[in-house]
Amino acid sequence: MQKETWRFIDSGNASPAFNMALDEALLYWHSEKKIPPVIRFYGWNPATLSVGYFQNIKKEINFEAVHKYNLGFVRRPTGGRGVLHDQELTYSVIVSEEHPEMPATVTEAYRVISEGILQGFRNLGLDAYFAIPRTEKEKESLKNPRSSVCFDAPSWYELVVEGRKVAGSAQTRQKGVILQHGSILLDLDEDKLFDLFLYPSERVRERMQRNFKNKAVAINELIEKRVTMDEARKAFKEGFETGLNIHLEPYELSQEELDFVHHLAETKYASDEWNYKR
């Protein structure tokens, strides 16, 4: 059977506003049938704290720490909680809800898309699998997250290696198109991450950070020989091709497309109105 060809865009390191604008632009172009489905890899310059679309930043985010670490800040178009984008490979997948391989429900579509990430971890020699909540108590805990920190609890079909979460993802559906994006951690500075949030007390912070160590992990904590960003890109690009049974064709944005993205970045994702609205 012939493999379907999707576009592959590696946009390198870019500003937080540009990164979110390009994801939205790809969703829009795909909804207009101007482009096929897309897998995109990217990084962040500067390192950035992103928050979920619905997140209340006044109650949850420590902006003194965000400024102290010279971090970028952006609100995502997707839900979920706070993510520090630093030593990671970030990916996005843009595909129509009508695609024959895409299930109708969010969780099942997440599982299908994340098969590419699962294969990527396996390409690096890691034994990755999907965590599925087994008990009613586990299911309830997913509905009521205790923490502002995205990696603090495995969610439905979360990717896990040796019982600890290795890739956090979020999904939105607009204009009949699925946008899923997420973080693949190579390394993680836990103290910096936990500085970025507000807590009822120092004791609560200490307890959460202690629990976090048992739940979340970066690739280079699990592998003896350190994985470079280039090695990660290769492993996960091949992982998506295997996991989704597709062929990825590299694509460079045209100047016209770049102009569209820059305009969207400036007018929406770099604006206080968007970022500080909650």
UniProtKB/Swiss-Prot annotation:
It holds the Pfam family LplA-B_cat. It is an enzyme of class 2 (transferase). Residues 33-248 form the BPL/LPL catalytic domain. The record marks K165 as: Lowers pKa of active site Cys. One of its GO terms (biological process) is protein lipoylation. It comes from the Bacteria. It catalyses: octanoyl-[ACP] + L-lysyl-[protein] = N(6)-octanoyl-L-lysyl-[protein] + holo-[ACP] + H(+). Disruption phenotype: Cells lacking this gene are auxotrophic for lipoic acid when grown in minimal medium but grow as well as the wild-type strain in the presence of lipoic acid. The requirement for lipoic acid can be bypassed by addition of both acetate and branched-chain fatty acid (BCFA) precursors. The mutant cells are devoid of lipoylated proteins. Keywords: Acyltransferase, Transferase. The keyword Transferase applies. Pathway: Protein modification; protein lipoylation via endogenous pathway; protein N(6)-(lipoyl)lysine from octanoyl-[acyl-carrier-protein]. Its EC number is 2.3.1.181. Coiled coil: none annotated. The keyword Acyltransferase applies. The active site is at C150. Catalyzes the transfer of endogenously produced octanoic acid from octanoyl-acyl-carrier-protein onto the lipoyl domain of GcvH, an intermediate carrier during protein lipoylation. Is also able to catalyze the reverse reaction. Octanoyl-CoA can also act as a substrate although very poorly. Does not display lipoate protein ligase activity, despite its sequence similarity to LplA. Belongs to the octanoyltransferase LipM family. PANTHER family: OCTANOYL-[GCVH]:PROTEIN N-OCTANOYLTRANSFERASE, OCTANOYLTRANSFERASE LIPM-RELATED. Monomer. In the reaction, the free carboxyl group of octanoic acid is attached via an amide linkage to the epsilon-amino group of a specific lysine residue of lipoyl domains of lipoate-dependent enzymes. The reaction proceeds via an octanoyl-thioester enzyme intermediate. This is Octanoyltransferase LipM. It comes from Bacillus subtilis (strain 168).
